[in-house]
Amino acid sequence: MAWTALLLSLLAHFTGSVASYELTQPLSVSVALGQTARITCGGNNIGSKNVHWYQQKPGQAPVLVIYRDSNRPSGIPERFSGSNSGNTATLTISRAQAGDEADYYCQVWDSSTAH
């Protein structure tokens, strides 16, 4: 049976010395195959911080898909893109494929507070 929709879940993680920094995100995002998925990660003035995105499939280690807001590591398809401004960082997956179904983690790195 062909996949008709993907369920993308999101977990958030903050790295830095300010443990009280809070991130908000949808528990899941559903998208039809071939359509565009947008997964958000919200935080106060998150646009001033570095956001990294990871994809994790069951039984596998996380894979970095976007680093420092909008950069793709080698081997990651151009369908994956990122943006970060104001209070929201967004991971965009264009032309969604069945293989994109996974957990997606946003990691926020605040270099101004890290030691």
UniProtKB/Swiss-Prot annotation:
Start and end residues of each stretch annotated as Framework-3: 71-106
Annotated stretches, region: Framework-2: 51-67
Transmembrane intervals: none
SMART domains the record matches: IG (SM00409), IGv (SM00406)
Keywords: Adaptive immunity, Cell membrane, Disulfide bond, Immunity, Immunoglobulin, Immunoglobulin domain, Membrane, Secreted, Signal
Residue stretches making up the Ig-like domain: 21-115
Gene3D superfamilies per the UniProt record, alphabetical: Immunoglobulins
Region (Complementarity-determining-3): 107-115
Compartments where located: Secreted; Cell membrane
GO biological process: adaptive immune response; immune response
Disulfide bonds: C41-C106
InterPro entries tied to this protein: Ig-like_dom (IPR007110), Ig-like_dom_sf (IPR036179), Ig-like_fold (IPR013783), Ig_sub (IPR003599), Ig_V-set (IPR013106), IgV_Light_Chain (IPR050150)
Signal peptide region: 1-20
Stretch list, region Complementarity-determining-1: 42-50
Main location: secreted
UniProt keyword annotation of Signal present: yes
Cellular component terms per the entry's GO annotation: extracellular region; immunoglobulin complex; plasma membrane
Region of interest (Complementarity-determining-2), residue spans: 68-70
Subunit structure: Immunoglobulins are composed of two identical heavy chains and two identical light chains; disulfide-linked.
UniProt cross-references to PANTHER family, sorted A to Z: IMMUNOGLOBULIN LIGHT CHAIN
Function statement: V region of the variable domain of immunoglobulin light chains that participates in the antigen recognition. Immunoglobulins, also known as antibodies, are membrane-bound or secreted glycoproteins produced by B lymphocytes. In the recognition phase of humoral immunity, the membrane-bound immunoglobulins serve as receptors which, upon binding of a specific antigen, trigger the clonal expansion and differentiation of B lymphocytes into immunoglobulins-secreting plasma cells.
Name listed for the protein in its UniProt record: Immunoglobulin lambda variable 3-9
